[in-house]
């Protein structure tokens, strides 16, 4: 059992919900990106038919993905719930319903995504420091993506944050409590559409978030 048991339980409920309603595992468009999550029956589709969706199953890593590179680069200690949330599994994004709306939780699809995620976490925190705002770590989005779901590093509480602004609404006292309040949302996979983005030397928070979603959901 990990230090974030609600996440373990949510994965169990998530896959069960898809099995009960659709008779199969959740689907995702990997766009040619390999992952240990892809079910064996769909492995050939990843390369042979990259435009097709595949069934996936969350895979727990043998050991938790390390975050010491982030802590060293930023001279900061990450809240342990962040490490448990991002470092324990490879999975596709998780769709959810809740009393505060629908949304998605971000998860790394493979090791390359995990490493890219770390780069974006560093960029997000550097921008927070530039704005002289408390450190937060993004974990997903609400609705159409105009609002981020973030964990406050000092307390571990979960908030809604609009990019460039301070968190403005607390949703839960901990990431454990937050995930425990969610319900799996069964829905067909949506094929990502990449929108062109202008290149900038110092992209803002929202641009960084868009880049993150482009790489981790839309794929390169």
Curated annotation (Swiss-Prot):
Gene name, Swiss-Prot/TrEMBL: syd
Protein location: Cell inner membrane
Task performed by this protein: Interacts with the SecY protein in vivo. May bind preferentially to an uncomplexed state of SecY, thus functioning either as a chelating agent for excess SecY in the cell or as a regulatory factor that negatively controls the translocase function.
Domain of life per record: Bacteria
CDD domains referenced in this protein's UniProt entry, alphabetically: Syd
Keywords, comma-separated and alphabetical: Cell inner membrane, Cell membrane, Membrane
Disulphide bridges, residue numbers: none
GO annotation, cellular component aspect: cytoplasmic side of plasma membrane
Iron-sulfur as UniProt keyword: no
Lineage: Bacteria, Pseudomonadati, Pseudomonadota, Gammaproteobacteria, Alteromonadales
Organism for this UniProt entry: Shewanella loihica (strain ATCC BAA-1088 / PV-4)
Coiled-coil intervals: none
Protein topology in the membrane: Peripheral membrane protein
Designated name of the protein: Protein Syd
Family: Belongs to the Syd family.
